[in-house]
Amino acid sequence: MRRLSALLLATSFALVAQEHGAPAKSKAPAHAAAPASHAPAPAAEAPDSPSAALAELSAGNARFVAGRRTRTLDTGHDAAMRAALANGQAPFAVVITCSDSRVADALLFDQEAGRLFTIREAGNAPDLQGIASAEYAVEHLGSKLIVLMGHTSCGAVKAIREANGKPLPGNLWALQSGMAGLLETTPQDPNEDGKAYMARLEEANARRQAQNILDRSALLRERVGSEKLWIVPALYNLASGKVQFFKPISPAAEEAHH
C-alpha cells in the first residue's frame, strides 16, 4: 500500500508540473528533412559573344570530365526553371551532333534546359531541315555559336566505311548522301591501322559537316562574316568525356573550299 501511495503521489506531482508549464521532452519527427548540403546553382548568365559561348561550353565540359557538374545535378530550382522556360527560350549555342544515345550534350557540357539548341542526326550530318533549324536558332533565338560535334566509335561513320560505296539497305541511302565524299577525301594510308583510320574519319566528318552548313546557308555565312557567329567543329571522346574543339570555320576557309 505504501508503495502504491508513493507511486500515485509522484504521478500527481508530474501532472501538476506539466499543467504549470514544465517543458516536456519530445522526439523530433521521424520525417523531418535534413538540411540541404548545398544550395542550388544560380542561373548562369548567357554568354554575349561567340568566344564567350565557346568558353562556357569548354568550362562545362571540363566540369563534366572532372566529375564536378554543377548545373545538371541540383533539382531545387527545377520548378522555377520550368516556369521561366514556359515563357520562351534564348539558347546561346546550337549543338549539331549524332543521334547516338551515348552523346548527351546537355550533360557533357553541363548546361541546364533552355541553354542549348540541339539538332541530332545520325553521323552528325544535318540535312536541309537541320540547317534550317540552325538558322532559326541563330536568327530568331539569338544563338551565337554552332558546334558541329562528332564522336568516337561512331556507328554511322563505321557503316559508311564498311559499305565502301555500296548502297546501304532501306532509307540508309540518305545517310550515305549526307556523308558523300568522306572516304574519297580521306583515304586510308597504306600503313594506317583500322582504329587510327576510323579516328581520322570521325574528325574529318565533323570538319566536313561544319563546312557543309556554311556552304549551304547564306544566312549563316553572313553572320560568320560579320563575326556575330562562330561555327566550330568538335569531337567528343566517349571514353574520356572530353570534347576537342577545332578552329572555327571562316568565310575564307569556305571560299578556299570551293
Show the residue positions of the predicted features.
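Short beta-strand segments
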Residues: V95-C98, R120, V147-H151, V232-N237
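Divalent-metal-activated hydrolytic enzyme cores
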Residues: E19-G88, G114, G123-A132, Y136-L141, ...
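Sec-dependent N-terminal signal peptides
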Residues: M1-E19
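Short acidic/polar active-site loop segments enriched in Thr and Asp
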Residues: K144
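Gly/Ser/Thr-rich loops at beta-strand to alpha-helix junctions
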Residues: D100-R102, H151-A156
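Active-site cofactor/substrate anionic-group-binding motifs, chiefly glycine-
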Residues: F92, I96-S133
